[in-house]
Curated annotation (Swiss-Prot):
Keywords: Apoptosis, Golgi apparatus, Membrane, Transmembrane, Transmembrane helix. The keyword Disulfide bond does not apply. It comes from the Eukaryota. This is Protein lifeguard 4. GO terms for biological process: apoptotic process; locomotory behavior; negative regulation of apoptotic process; negative regulation of neuron apoptotic process; regulation of calcium-mediated signaling. Residues 1-38, 90-97, 142-151, 197-208, 230-238 are cytoplasmic. Pfam families: Bax1-I. It is found in: Golgi apparatus membrane. It comes from Mus musculus. GO terms for cellular component: endoplasmic reticulum membrane; Golgi membrane; Golgi stack. It is a multi-pass membrane protein.
Length: 238
């Protein structure tokens, strides 16, 4: 006869059910464990990016090296893109997914660090503080909200394609006004993605997909930061 004492371990059938469903429908302790993993990984990613950027800003030799070799930004960006593709293919392969996660974060951190060397340190600090405040506020709002944000996905991805196209056209028709408008729209777009991805990690992902959840939020943070940085510089030029 099965033991119904709550002190006994749960059955494997219950575990299979919880891990086969989305996070929101899993048991409380699985939800909390998932969130701890996601935000612990995310915190380490942001920490690595912050430290790397600070080193590039502090040491003049690194700044000079980047300014003399701006193609490094493209190399790091392409490396990040390739690693994202590999992570998508091996998202459930442990511990390979964690090794790929570290490599991706390092590559992305180097790309961001290279970019910020072209900006004033004061503007970088402002953008960092604004990004942190916005992310924490939107995360708190989304996690306690009862609204279904998945319906905004199509609009957000359409907006992303439009933003990419506008960014390409900007290469040929650059103006400070266009830079300001695109930076503003980009920042608003990635605020939307933070809400969408925070909602999705609870309602669309399974508990074992914490690596993908962390990467999605990390990319939202990086893109929000970079667009805020562009916005602040554009405003500063006016």
């Amino acid at each position: 006869m099965a033991d119904t004492d709550p002190g006994y371990p749960r059955s494997s059938i219950e575990d299979d059910f919880n891990y086969g469903s989305c996070v929101a429908s899993a048991s409380v302790h699985i939800r909390m464990a998932f969130l701890r993993k996601v935000y612990s990984i995310l915190s380490l990613q942001v920490l690595l990016t912050t430290v790397t950027s600070a080193l590039f800003l502090y040491f003049q030799a690194l700044r000079t090296f980047v300014h003399e070799s701006p193609a490094l930004i493209v190399v790091f960006a392409l490396g990040s893109l390739g690693l994202i593709f590999a992570l998508t293919l091996h998202r459930h392969t442990h511990p390979l997914n964690l090794y790929l996660l570290f490599a991706f974060t390092l590559s992305e951190s180097l790309a961001v660090a290279a970019v910020v060397t072209f900006y004033d340190v004061y503007l970088v600090l402002q953008a960092f503080i604004m990004t942190t405040a916005v992310f924490l506020g939107l995360t708190a709002y989304t996690l306690q909200s009862k609204r279904d944000f998945t319906k905004f996905g199509a609009g957000l991805f359409a907006g992303l394609w439009i933003l990419c196209l506008a960014g390409f056209l900007k290469l040929f028709f650059y103006s400070e006004t266009m830079e300001l408008v695109l930076a503003s729209l980009g920042a608003l777009l990635f605020c939307g993605f933070i809400i969408y991805d925070t909602h999705s990690l609870m309602h669309r992902l399974s508990p074992e997909e914490y690596v993908i959840a962390a990467i999605s939020l990390y990319m939202d943070i990086i893109n929000l930061f970079l667009h805020l940085l562009k916005f602040l510089e554009a405003v500063n030029k006016k």
